[in-house]
């Protein structure tokens, strides 16, 4: 019943008319859907030994990650018959579909295709040390630590520590390396949005960044710019380094041309040329290409090899006729690894399918049976919408809803 303890090794099975929400001691929360089979294979919340291995054999779950996954995603995993799932600061859903089960469920739901989401605009392809991001729409929220494959979004503000850097690839094939002890903002980024002009606007807040431009800005230079404290940088098909210090802005062009605009006018410099601008009222003065301002261990982004780069944002149409594992991410970063050993990274509003052979693909849009799931994300708790969607009729008294509508929960021990 309510508040019952669950232990390492326990197996939980739900019937056709039941579901349960579980809370683990590290803060992980999982909703186990009807007709599911779930095992707590391994769980430890002890310092130095934190690890969790959970298994979904059948059915589905909806999960919100806790401290173990958030601090070390590799130490928290959920396996299905074909997939291993690791999450970081994420809300996500997992379904194991057998035969035509999910196709039949999908057919019963409201007609109409789910609109594909375009939230993820870049991914981390190389990282060292501590690098974090926070949405510029709410700088008061907790920053999220970035890891290899982490998704990035328009308005994100990134920051690296003194020993950290990150190389980022954007959907238009542009790249940026955020150097050590630096910060920059993705002020606005749009690509292939119906009725809107493509745009890539960035802001260097402090420290250094190394930039390789992509397709945005090639046809219209005004579609791409980097704002700094002392000048706005426009591009002409370009690779360049910028370093913002208390003494001003140092710029080095190693490919193409940039235009520097401030109160003193506009100056164009081409590869291979470097200069320094003291403040927004000053014209640039030449400096050596090996000036100390450009010293960094962070690589030029064009020199970083990215395995399977065409797959970073590639999506496939949905085909529900075959069995396999579906993952739908509502927030955060989830990494899916099929039994073929290949990773697939998912961000907010992205979903994937892994077939019985263990091959994973990113989907153009989530299936309706996941997007319209009436069972609650555990981070949201029980919702009255559950009753409106008919879920009351699915619940068994063994997992009783009280008159106030609270769902049975477990505090899960080690």
Predicted features by range, described:
Residues 1-3, 7-8, 15-33, 45-53, ...:
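C-terminal interaction modules
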Residues 40-41, 63-64:
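Signal-peptide-cleaved, periplasmic/extracellular N-terminal interaction regions immediately downstream
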Residues 61-63, 209-214, 258-259, 334-337:
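Hydrophobic lipid-interacting interfaces of membrane-associated proteins
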